[in-house]
């Protein structure tokens, strides 16, 4: 197919013509060997675009999702995915800063002319492919978006590895937003997670574009197919009907071990497609003109994607990456007791805790801690029924995890245990909402991933399925399956799927509505939570497998002299600063022997889920917390200026913000006064210092 014809039309088409144009030899553009078939989509910036899928700022902000047909097309699913992923990562309310401090702020036409303000639509070209050379059966989806106003004379690439377990559009509203607006190519990776859902009932799977197909017919085109023979699938369903296998949990691949390389592969993909378009054409082939030495490459993203960016910089032996700018990174460090973190009178020794350790600890104690009087009035407390929380407290007391005789006393004991384990006191108001919406699915998904358990093993008697009103597993509704690419986040509960407690008294039930065999009570499945915890604290082959997989994902904090900025909210209850960014700064100072160029910015009144700030069902987020996304964008601005204009980086510091006034659920609109900038010369009392592994953070 003529590549120019593909570029001229606004629908997906194979890029086989481009792939064939590279000639062997030094200096000629060649398709990387790890790439599968490349599919290309060009968008005009009017009916469709790279950043908002044609929805514009108003469409992203609307509470009404875009309509899809009964058999949704790839274009419809892409639009739905961009809509939901954008809204899942940032606060899209005007009062929260969307459309003023961040969001689709500019208009860029197909000729590259920029005007502001606008609806934020950005014309350009999108390239999509599987990375297929991982040594196992799993796949990573990669994508490159090249805006029409990309300047080949001043090329730049920003990475957008997905956060959480999200699919390929998971970073569209974070580093994707900044990079596209800046005119950079954005290199995305789903890092082997995403909405790979294998419906075992119908034996259907998702494809790279989100449409679904029969697993046998899809073959290697499947995003994820469970490792079961036909006989094994049939036998499993006979005992456990209507179950669904999910890629991150059930691929048996420990995908996190590859997240750094996945990010680097996305950058390599970006260099390839940029040179296909902008390289110098000769009779022998296309000569590469956009190269690492003349291209600004910033590794970026947030949460899991931020950790992937840091890992990529550590693993980058080709000098592809020039700098790093990340937010709230989920990063796990190799043990080193030479690291110390001091905040006021609090001193913590060592490099924090692994994700599975602290998440399974939270999974046990958080539903009891919500009964602490100190957590009263927290956003989301209505989602944690007090009677069930009291039952969890009773079970924990029986197992001697906590003390106390009343629910309030036991809640205090559980909250004290969380703070003693490493959570900041500022995260207390987040306990209820995080348990309600985040912690249990993360604990379960990573138990499966680190233990390399298949769907048929039902680790700790858990599985995934759709349910009826009573919580009983039912067939996954066809409409939910068909739109799962656009609505899911890669980690059930999502896309109509729920977590099932297969050991519930009376038969399998939705986890939150199940009855624990050991207590005979509704207590948020304490038996399952204890089992997940035992995979970290206990012995046996499964626990050893989990520990070995965690060892595989731990990093050294050796950034090889690259400049880097980490921004993190002090109140983060999902990826606490004491387990991640603070000790990373200390370990980096040891790894780079005092020659580090890493800066760490901690932000008061900021936490992990900016999208919760504007969520109507979580009143109180808006009057307590400011958007960390403001500082993530600032970090990218500062890094870009440092790399292009040699402006100095600011010192590590604490930024003291001011929450919005008003009543919970009706906060006044945010202004710049609520979110003061990162300072080039912060007050002495706000400096964060690091020396020989010791990090000192202002109180």
From Swiss-Prot:
Q: What is its EC number?
A: 3.1.1.22
Task: List the subcellular locations.
Answer: Secreted
In what pathway does it function? Lipid metabolism; butanoate metabolism
The protein's predominant localisation is: secreted
Q: Which InterPro entries match?
A: AB_hydrolase_fold (IPR029058), OHBut_olig_hydro_put (IPR016582)
UniProt keyword terms in alphabetical order: Hydrolase, Secreted, Signal
Task: Tell me the first and last residues of the signal peptide.
Answer: 1-19
Q: According to its UniProt record, which residues of this chain constitute the active site?
A: 303
Q: Does the keyword Secreted apply?
A: yes
Q: Name one GO biological process term.
A: butyrate metabolic process
What Pfam family is a match for this entry?
3HBOH
The UniProt catalytic activity note for this protein reads: (3R)-hydroxybutanoate dimer + H2O = 2 (R)-3-hydroxybutanoate + H(+)
Q: Record keywords: Hydrolase included?
A: yes
- Could you tell me which SUPFAM superfamilies the record lists for this protein? alpha/beta-Hydrolases (SSF53474)
Q: Which GO terms describe its cellular component?
A: extracellular space
Molecular functions per Gene Ontology? hydroxybutyrate-dimer hydrolase activity
Q: Which family does it belong to?
A: Belongs to the D-(-)-3-hydroxybutyrate oligomer hydrolase family.
Role summary: Participates in the degradation of poly-3-hydroxybutyrate (PHB). It works downstream of poly(3-hydroxybutyrate) depolymerase, hydrolyzing D(-)-3-hydroxybutyrate oligomers of various length (3HB-oligomers) into 3HB-monomers.
Protein known as: D-(-)-3-hydroxybutyrate oligomer hydrolase
């Amino acid at each position: 197919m003529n590549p120019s014809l593909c570029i001229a039309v606004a629908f997906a088409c194979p890029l086989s013509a481009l792939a064939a144009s590279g000639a062997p030899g030094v200096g000629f553009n060649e398709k990387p060997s790890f790439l599968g078939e490349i599919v290309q989509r060009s968008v005009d910036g009017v009916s469709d675009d790279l950043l908002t899928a044609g929805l514009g700022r108003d469409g992203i902000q609307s509470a009404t999702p875009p309509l899809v047909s009964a058999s949704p097309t790839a274009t419809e699913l892409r639009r739905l995915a961009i809509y939901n992923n954008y809204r899942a990562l940032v606060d899209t309310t005007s009062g929260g800063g969307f459309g003023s401090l961040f969001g689709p702020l500019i208009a860029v036409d197909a000729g590259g002319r920029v005007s502001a303000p606008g609806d934020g639509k950005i014309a350009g070209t999108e390239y999509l492919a599987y990375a297929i050379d991982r040594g196992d059966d799993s796949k990573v989806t990669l994508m490159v978006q090249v805006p029409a106003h990309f300047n080949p004379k001043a090329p730049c690439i920003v990475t957008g590895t997905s956060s959480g377990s999200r699919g390929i559009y998971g970073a569209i509203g974070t580093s994707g937003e900044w990079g596209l607006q800046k005119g950079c190519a954005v290199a995305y990776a789903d890092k082997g997670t995403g909405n790979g859902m294998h419906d075992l009932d119908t034996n259907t799977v998702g494809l790279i574009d989100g449409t679904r197909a029969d697993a046998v017919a899809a073959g290697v085109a499947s995003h994820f197919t469970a490792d079961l023979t036909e006989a094994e699938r049939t036998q499993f369903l006979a005992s456990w009907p209507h179950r669904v296998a999910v890629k991150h949990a059930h691929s048996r691949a420990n995908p996190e071990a590859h997240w750094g390389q996945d990010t680097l592969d996305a950058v390599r993909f970006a260099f390839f497609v940029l040179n296909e378009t902008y390289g110098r054409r000769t009779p022998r082939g296309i000569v590469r003109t956009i190269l690492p030495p003349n291209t600004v490459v910033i590794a970026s993203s947030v949460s899991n994607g931020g950790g992937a960016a840091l890992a990529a910089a550590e693993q980058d032996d080709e000098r592809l990456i020039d700098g790093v700018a990340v937010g709230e990174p989920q990063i796990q460090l190799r043990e080193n007791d030479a690291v110390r973190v001091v905040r006021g009178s609090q001193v913590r020794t060592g490099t924090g805790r692994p994700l599975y350790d602290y998440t399974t600890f939270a999974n046990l104690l958080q539903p009891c801690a919500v009964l602490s009087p100190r957590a009263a009035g927290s956003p989301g407390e209505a989602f944690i029924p007090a009677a069930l929380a009291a039952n969890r407290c009773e079970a924990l007391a029986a197992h001697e995890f906590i003390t106390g005789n009343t629910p309030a006393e036991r809640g205090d004991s559980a909250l004290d245990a969380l703070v003693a384990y490493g959570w900041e006191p500022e995260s207390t108001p987040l306990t209820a909402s995080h348990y309600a919406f985040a912690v249990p699915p993360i604990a379960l998904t990573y138990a499966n991933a680190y233990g390399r358990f298949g769907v048929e093993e039902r680790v700790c008697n858990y599985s995934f399925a759709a349910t009826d009103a009573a919580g009983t597993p039912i067939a996954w509704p066809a409409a939910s399956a068909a739109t799962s690419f656009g609505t899911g986040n890669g980690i059930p509960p999502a896309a109509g799927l729920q977590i099932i407690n297969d050991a519930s008294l009376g038969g399998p039930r939705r986890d939150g509505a199940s009855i624990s065999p050991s207590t005979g009570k509704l207590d948020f499945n304490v038996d399952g939570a204890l089992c997940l915890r035992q995979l970290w604290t206990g012995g046996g082959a499964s626990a050893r497998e989990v520990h070995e997989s965690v060892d595989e994902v731990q990093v050294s904090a050796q950034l090889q002299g690259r400049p880097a900025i980490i921004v993190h909210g002090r109140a983060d209850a999902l990826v606490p600063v004491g387990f991640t960014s603070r000790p990373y700064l200390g370990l980096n100072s040891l790894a780079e022997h005092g020659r580090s160029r890493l800066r760490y910015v901690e932000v008061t009144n900021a936490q992990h889920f900016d999208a919760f700030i504007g969520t109507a069902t979580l009143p109180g987020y808006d009057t307590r917390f400011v958007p960390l996304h403001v500082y993530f964008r600032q970090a990218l601005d500062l890094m870009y200026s440092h790399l292009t204009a040699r402006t100095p980086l600011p010192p590590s510091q604490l930024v003291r913000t001011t929450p919005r006034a008003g009543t919970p659920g009706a906060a006044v609109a945010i202004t710049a006064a609520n979110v003061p900038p990162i300072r080039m010369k912060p007050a002495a009392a706000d400096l964060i210092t690091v020396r020989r592994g010791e990090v000192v953070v202002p109180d």
